[in-house]
């Protein structure tokens, strides 16, 4: 264990020195990526170092209720239904929102009434929620209001990283090259649809129509013909009324993982990996999570050394551009002439052992359990409150 990691573990406020720091692992949530979050949480709960951390697992239902869920309950649920949603649990909990109080509040409900009792003291929260109401700054703001340390990016970085429009604005301001795109607001489509069609035609086909604030490729459609544009827009609008429409780019899809530095040191970038999509027009939800042969993931990517270094440098620039903390995955296109174009940043990437973020760190010498340790240690180094 490094000195910085030891210091991080020792500085958890309120923790009894004779006990291990307690980490609350959060999963589920209200977004369309609820089931993906459960898969991520199962992987983390299997691998987390329980010799170093006490663990409390908290599931959030699709209507936003918080319950204690054991690892065994989660395992049984996913064994019976791989893309499951959480049922209501037996023990409901909430966060205290008074400064200085960090114990979960346990609901004791009976037919005659109920009461709240204090549960476990929480030293850090590991939020494993993907998409809106989890990865977009809303949950991060709640944790800051509750004076709880947490893994990952803060409110502003999470919000920017969830919005495909504003992340591009941040990238451009940092000097990174982004592909051609246009933003379609709700009023644009409702009142001036023909102007939207004209803007898209200027990009040239194919284009990718995307909800601005959704993940796991939900609502994304590749459009090769103008006559298919309207239906793609309506599909995306089911997930978000703000859309980003991007010109198609001919290039290899390359990703790079970023990990924060200890004691405010510079972020670290992994070796990059490559996604080779098979049988799909792009890396969609089915290729990511449903079909075993939907994509081939290669790490490290077979690229010239100078391109690898450029990718790592640009990943750190992108991380800093959104004011990232903890972790992020940066997605790029590398064109046939080795031009590097950033596509997006993901502030809570897929985190199963076969997901690209952990795989890229494993290829860089940091194994899955150690990566989890690093992220929790980084969270414990940060102050409570606004970040």
Predicted features and spans:
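Short beta-strand-to-turn element immediately C-terminal to the catalytic PLP-Schiff-base lysine
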Residues: 184, 220-225, 258-261, 335, ...
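Glycine-rich phosphate-binding loop of ATP-grasp-fold ATP-dependent ligases
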Residues: 37, 179-183, 206-231, 253-255
